[in-house]
Amino acid sequence: YDMGLNYIIQGIMYLEKLIELVPAPANPVGNDDSSIVYKKLGIYLPEDYFNFLHVYGAGMFGNSLEVFSPFIKNPYMNFFNQIVILRDSYNSMKQLWIGLNLSSVFPTGSGYPFDFYPAEGGLIPWGCIEGCGTFFYWKPNYSGWEIVAYNDDEYQVFQMSMTEFIYNVFSSNIDFAGLSEITKKDLCFTTCQ
């Protein structure tokens, strides 16, 4: 899973495929200054995320899949706000999971084995499915940015970019319980302020 030129090209390719599937808004809401994010987090996020925000802006697909943005004030969709909220929630669940020794009871693919940003290699949230407990994170590692999808305490790791993941969700190429709410009616994008 190469983070170099191949990763960037694939991100662009899947963004173009996504635009064919779900047309982008004429006037996306947001800002193109990715340096704001680096200054605040101290890390560079995947380029396809900023390409997505440039084309689509802040908003959601249908009434379901939301993509957080650092460039809007809406607290429910603001990227920085969601980092704090989801970090606190995730870490609380992780401590409960460890305290009750639930990893010995539940199968692999359940629980909270990851650290959360700002820990090195910690999860960074980028989106969710509205109202159903499904969240999407990046997991940075030495070989690339993986996607970790969580539905309550069950998770799955996908080795693909964010735009590839979203495209595959809407193309029904990903089998994950938390995505069962996605339907053809969600093949539209609504901008948010």
Task: Label each PLM-derived region with a short phrase.
Residues D2-G131, Q193:
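A surface-exposed partner-binding patch
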Residues E130-G133, D153-Y155:
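Glycine-centered tight beta-turn/hairpin loop motif at sheet-sheet or coil-to-beta transitions
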Residues G133-K139:
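Short, surface-exposed beta-strand/loop micro-motifs that present aromatic residues
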Residues S143-Y150:
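Short polybasic amphipathic segments
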Residues N151, Y155-G178:
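Compact, glycine/acidic-enriched structural inserts
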Residues G178-L179, L187:
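Charged phosphate-binding loop/patch that engages nucleotide di/tri-phosphates or the phosphate backbone
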Residues L187-Q193:
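Charge-dense, low-complexity intrinsically disordered regions
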